[in-house]
Amino acid sequence: MGKIILTGDRPTGKLHLGHYVGSLRRRVELQNLGDYDKMFVFMADVQALTDNADNPEKIRQNIIEVALDYLSAGLSPEKCTLYIQSQIPEIAELTTFLMNLVSVSRVQRNPTVKTEIKMRNFEANIPMGFFAYPVSQAADIAAFKATTVPAGEDQEPMLELTRELVRRFNQIYAPVLVEPAIMLPENATARRLPGTDGKEKMSKSLGNCIYLSDDADTVWKNVKTMYTDPTHLNVSDPGHVEGNTVFTYLDTFSTDEDFAEFWPEFQNLDELKAAYTAGGIGDMKCKKLLNSVLNKMLDPIRARRHEYEQDIPEIYNILKKGSLEARETAAQTMDEVRAAMQINYFEDTDLIQSQAERFRQK
């Protein structure tokens, strides 16, 4: 069995820095390392529709936005398979079969489901598709026999449910499906980058995002208003770096080379932190450094995006080709699933012959 990695995003909006450090940057690294036999990256439009059923146009428009973000960030259709979830009907079929192997109470115990139901005010009227999406996620993974799923800690309950369903299927029918392992982000900051306002999560709905496609002026506008240390009222005052969003971002994005280029007075971030803590460093100077660091990183991403935007039909061709390739893989898995469940009636020649013999002997 080969090493297969699978990951994706809900296409409900353009991708931001939180997506980039949480998963996208790591995906590009994994793709380029070449340690995996196959890499699948998909846009989960079916899942996005579970809480956007009345607004399919939102999903339709954002498919291309996410695809552009994928490609401009460095994902290559030559090295990974990019596809759209809804174009793989085998996933829906496998979801139906897996639903028979899990109880409603088991899905209800998933803490991520509980949190998202509350966040969307679904307590009194939960759409069935939304409630059952963890089973659909399990099918997403199992259909491609993924061995590794990069995800945040909040997705561990989903991965555990996937493993349970895979084990139960294999025990009841045949050892066809593969139990996946989670790959967590390498550091705590990458697991959840705070919003520019200091809130725990960067979110479009909170208006605290910096998007990968934002121009330099927009980036500066967001950095300039970024939450810092509310007690650091004067430049001479000692500052606090803990909980200071500017320093959280510098921890995540800056390098020693950035200091040599943009603030040679300091050799690295540790030296700047020490000086800021001692007093004498203004917040605006730190924000200007962060702005330079972010734009240096985003410049090539924006340039690639501009190039891809000149040929949108080709982007759809890439997604179509990837979806066809992904469907071939999922279809092969489903052939094995149906055979294991003994519902491959027309391919089971032994069944046909035995039934014919039984009726001949009547």
Feature map (PLM): residue ranges:
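Extreme N-terminus of proteins, especially the signal/transit-peptide cleavage junction
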Residues: 1-3, 346-347
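N-terminal Rossmann-like or analogous alpha/beta NTP/dinucleotide-binding catalytic cores
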Residues: 2-139, 296, 306
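Pocket-edge structural micro-motifs
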Residues: 7-9, 84, 145, 195, ...
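A broad detector of the eukaryotic-type serine/threonine protein kinase catalytic domain
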Residues: 10, 47-48, 144-149, 207, ...
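Structured ligand/cofactor/substrate-binding pocket environments in proteins
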Residues: 15-24, 39-40, 45, 55-59, ...
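A short secondary-structure junction signal
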Residues: 109-112, 146, 174, 205
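Conserved nucleotide- and phosphate/pyrophosphate-binding catalytic cores
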Residues: 163-362
